[in-house]
Swiss-Prot record:
Pathway: Glycan biosynthesis; glycogen biosynthesis. The gene is glgA. Residues 471-513 are annotated as: Disordered. Keywords: Glycogen biosynthesis, Glycosyltransferase, Transferase. Belongs to the glycosyltransferase 1 family. Bacterial/plant glycogen synthase subfamily. This is Glycogen synthase. It comes from Synechococcus sp. (strain CC9902). Its EC number is 2.4.1.21. GO terms for biological process: glycogen biosynthetic process. It catalyses: [(1->4)-alpha-D-glucosyl](n) + ADP-alpha-D-glucose = [(1->4)-alpha-D-glucosyl](n+1) + ADP + H(+). InterPro entries: Glyco_trans_1, GS/SS, Starch_synth_cat_dom. GO terms for molecular function: alpha-1,4-glucan glucosyltransferase (ADP-glucose donor) activity; alpha-1,4-glucan glucosyltransferase (UDP-glucose donor) activity. Synthesizes alpha-1,4-glucan chains using ADP-glucose. It comes from the Bacteria. ADP-alpha-D-glucose binds at K15.
Length: 513
């Protein structure tokens, strides 16, 4: 099956969050199942030094009144074909942010749609997060291309409809207040990156004001757990580590701990309980919760804390102040460094993820793979990946807490600290986490089933009045539309675009060839 990924990130070249890991690692696993998977992404200026890109593009075209070029390259580790949308708007050294962010990603989405119609036509176009949210809208009237939309983080929803009307051409059948909502309505299948998150986003607490809409489209919504690349993340072969180790022999992990303590300016103590955290410093990740309990933890236990990440200035300042109060016990590195992140996974005894919400989370998978026991909140993908430690039954791989409260988090930390005193059982806990199978091969099978289910399928345009009623949280069941007194919208009977025609032609005022 021909599958085209459209995304704003791809590891290891361009990575800000978990989406980059998914886009970089899932395609090779799908290729093992016989699929021809390719990627289209923005041609960021950083990529020209990281990939071998020919001087001449393979295609030139125009969209949104702007010319662009598409270059072909290969993924540096797995050989996947990558198409880069080249335009000066992608030249600045940034991925997200900037005043032109909405225009920039809408332009990319439009270019990706044009490429799919005119150069390499996939059977399934797999879109990732709001940056590609307009693609399912434009593809909705093309019977030859089915669309899948993956929600990596529902909190970020893209430009609102009024702005889209100004910067691009919104089809007459488009519904939804913003890019994310439009994608949820028009995609033929929707998935979240963990089963628990797929259920949570249908509630008011985690639905980011889209829970009504997500309940409306629940028939095409599913949760598929993320995985990790077990070859790229293997402590037995990782060249970034000062010593390698495995579940069968943990000797090298003690060496990694000592090197981490030395590099971060901590007291070099084998008996210290070293806690690691590699994260974006944002509200979602629970860094504020750590700041509320860290003083007590560092004052009354022999714990040490290492934090790596960047983000909110207030959280950065709070962490700097914490480190200054506890020299030798707390260290903060406000940047992102892949080699250092691997050393933290390898050198830490436990790994912190006290998230407010967590669509899936990949850091806890890396941590377990490297023998760092996760301390997490029971939310989203953390529920699906970190079973709670049960010392009586010798089960579980981490320590969990339920409420987003300092006392709950602190209690979980103390439980982990006490468990660390019993080294033999602690090593058993580490080994259970290291031998769990969270490979992409398992996840790829579920994506394969979804692709086969959606290929050749086009979901009908939902009735506008019924959609509006359901999105406002009213008790409407889309399967019982005949029992609800609403007027059918004209879009419900709109004719499909004939095969071989580009639905954007009439939007751009062009004739079909």
């Amino acid at each position: 099956m021909r599958i085209l990924f459209a995304a704003a990130e791809c590891a290891p070249m361009i990575k800000v969050g978990g989406m980059g890991d998914v886009v970089g690692s899932l395609p090779p696993a799908l290729a093992k199942l016989g699929h021809d998977v390719r990627l289209i992404m923005p041609g960021y200026s950083q990529l020209w030094s990281k990939l071998q890109i020919p001087d001449e593009p393979i295609w030139r075209a125009q969209t949104m009144g702007t010319e662009f070029a598409v270059y072909e390259a290969k993924h540096p580790t797995n050989g996947m074909t990558i198409y880069l949308v080249g335009h000066p708007v992608f030249d600045p050294e940034r991925i997200y942010g900037g005043e032109d962010e909405d225009w920039r990603f809408t332009f990319f989405a439009s270019a990706a749609a044009e490429f799919s119609w005119n150069v390499w036509k996939p059977q399934v176009l797999h879109c990732h997060d709001w940056h590609t949210g307009m693609i399912p809208v434009w593809m909705h009237q093309d019977p030859e291309i089915s669309t899948v939309f993956t929600i990596h983080n529902l909190k970020y929803q893209g430009p609102w409809r009024w702005k889209l009307d100004r910067i691009t051409w919104c089809p007459w059948y488009m519904q939804g207040d913003h890019t994310m909502a439009a994608a949820l309505i028009n995609a033929d299948r929707v998935n979240a990156v963990s089963p628990t998150y797929a259920q949570e986003i249908r509630t008011a607490e985690y639905g980011e004001n889209l829970h009504g809409l997500l309940n409306f489209v629940s028939g095409k919504l599913r949760g598929i757990l993320n995985g990790i690349d077990l070859e790229a993340w293997d402590p037995a072969t990782d060249k970034a580590l000062p010593a390698n180790y495995s579940a069968a022999d943990l000797t090298g992990k003690a060496v990694c701990k000592q090197v981490l303590q030395e590099r971060m300016g901590l007291e070099v103590r084998d008996d210290a309980f070293l806690l690691g955290m590699v994260t974006r410093l944002v509200d979602q990740k629970g860094v504020d919760l750590l700041l509320q309990v860290a003083d007590r933890l560092l004052s009354y236990t022999d714990s040490q804390i290492v934090v790596l990440g960047t983000g909110d200035r207030g959280l950065e300042s709070g962490l700097w102040q914490l480190a200054s109060r506890y020299p030798g016990k707390c260290a903060v590195f406000l940047t992102y460094d892949d080699d250092l992140s691997r050393l933290i996974y390898a050198g830490s005894d436990a790994f912190l993820m006290p998230s407010r919400f967590e669509p899936c989370g990949i850091s806890q998978l890396y941590a377990m793979r490297y023998g760092s026991v996760p301390v997490v909140r029971n939310v989203g993908g953390l529920v699906d990946t970190v079973p709670p430690h049960d010392p009586n039954a010798d089960r579980g791989t981490g320590f969990c807490f339920d409420r987003f409260e300092p006392v709950d988090f602190y209690t979980a930390l103390v439980r982990a600290w006490e468990a660390y005193r019993h080294r033999s059982s602690w090593q058993d806990l580490q080994k259970r986490g290291m031998t769990e199978d969270y490979s992409w091969d398992r996840s790829a099978v579920e994506y394969d089933l979804m692709y086969k289910d959606v290929c050749g399928i086009k979901e009908p345009t939902p009735d506008a009045a019924l959609l509006e009623q359901f999105s406002r949280g009213q008790d409407a069941d889309p399967s019982r539309a005949d029992q609800i007194d609403v007027e059918p919208s004209s879009s419900s009977s709109a004719p499909m675009t004939p095969p071989g025609r580009n639905p954007l032609n009439r939007l751009f005022g062009r004739r079909s060839g």
